[in-house]
Amino acid sequence: MESLTLQPIELISGEVNLPGSKSVSNRALLLAALASGTTRLTNLLDSDDIRHMLNALTKLGVNYRLSADKTTCEVEGLGQAFHTTQPLELFLGNAGTAMRPLAAALCLGQGDYVLTGEPRMKERPIGHLVDALRQAGAQIEYLEQENFPPLRIQGTGLQAGTVTIDGSISSQFLTAFLMSAPLAQGKVTIKIVGELVSKPYIDITLHIMEQFGVQVINHDYQEFVIPAGQSYVSPGQFLVEGDASSASYFLAAAAIKGGEVKVTGIGKNSIQGDIQFADALEKMGAQIEWGDDYVIARRGELNAVDLDFNHIPDAAMTIATTALFAKGTTAIRNVYNWRVKETDRLAAMATELRKVGATVEEGEDFIVITPPTKLIHAAIDTYDDHRMAMCFSLVALSDTPVTINDPKCTSKTFPDYFDKFAQLSR
């Protein structure tokens, strides 16, 4: 297996322009495909998850032109749901942002589809979404394990009416249903059961739907009403924001070993909840400065925090490795959905933090981290999880090297992460 050893870094400083957001890129691609008119998407993320969505759209009859650097894409919208005459199998890798929304969208039109992916995708739950789609008349069957992909979908349209969705495992189930609801056969009301996790990701979905001309009435995240008679219309141009989760590594690095780092492509008006990571970093003692399209972080004396991170679970992973440089014991709470991500992130994070010398308590939905007096050089397993690789790069900000196994797993969202990290390192 390939590995990368990062030597101790004395100082982090400079400027980094973020790649496009994965969450925004795949949502916008799907809505551009369903919309009437041509949409020119700029700052699109070039990564595995986006490639899986683009490949699926090609098979579904969507025409698009991708620039040589793959960050600008002109999508010719269908102006309707997908209609295919031949059975199709769509392989979606480990891309939840493709699997969940496409599973819902393919119920809208006519066609016979199998949705599948990598072995890990077959361990990532989709039952709550399928249950909701079946309430609206969808014909979906599980081909292997109940509640998990692969799925077989017979497109027959989605009925109007009221459905309930369990929001406690993943917000992607609600996102998927919301994006398909305007093309259902009438008014749709979605009622949420349980605590809705990762609410800021729902805000991203609603914001992008609005840019494509669709209104959703949001009753305090407990009920969503999608009025009948709406359709998606291209906004013409669509700029994909920088990925706020990806910003977290550079902001944390500056907080630990700055200098100062300026991250461009996101700012105080970002639609992504993960920019709240900077607030958590500020609570730990970092100095943060906001602009319209940038965030600056500077070093501070870091102290432990005890916080609920249910709203920003992805960026919370970066707090776990930042905690190695903070005084005291840090607790990251209410992050059960780490367990159903690219890997079981609670178990993986606990295992790898212990390797570098931390004392760790792993609970069902929390992790408590006490740093050692000196970090240990360890080979970090990344579990084919891009965020594990990027989080543990921060260990090199100590006086100890760190070895990252399978560093190329960052290709899921940030293929040149380690190059960008090196450019800021002194």
Swiss-Prot record:
Lineage: Bacteria, Pseudomonadati, Pseudomonadota, Gammaproteobacteria, Vibrionales
Subunit description: Homotetramer.
Keyword Transferase in annotation: yes
Entry-linked HAMAP family: EPSP_synth (MF_00210)
Species annotation: Vibrio cholerae serotype O1 (strain ATCC 39315 / El Tor Inaba N16961)
Catalytic activity: 3-phosphoshikimate + phosphoenolpyruvate = 5-O-(1-carboxyvinyl)-3-phosphoshikimate + phosphate
InterPro entries: Enolpyruvate_Tfrase_dom, Enolpyruvate_Tfrase_sf, EPSP_synthase, EPSP_synthase_CS, RNA3'P_cycl/enolpyr_Trfase_a/b
Xref: CDD domains: EPSP_synthase
GO BP terms: amino acid biosynthetic process; aromatic amino acid family biosynthetic process; chorismate biosynthetic process
UniProt family annotation: Belongs to the EPSP synthase family.
GO molecular function: 3-phosphoshikimate 1-carboxyvinyltransferase activity
Protein name listed in UniProt: 3-phosphoshikimate 1-carboxyvinyltransferase
Role noted for this protein: Catalyzes the transfer of the enolpyruvyl moiety of phosphoenolpyruvate (PEP) to the 5-hydroxyl of shikimate-3-phosphate (S3P) to produce enolpyruvyl shikimate-3-phosphate and inorganic phosphate.
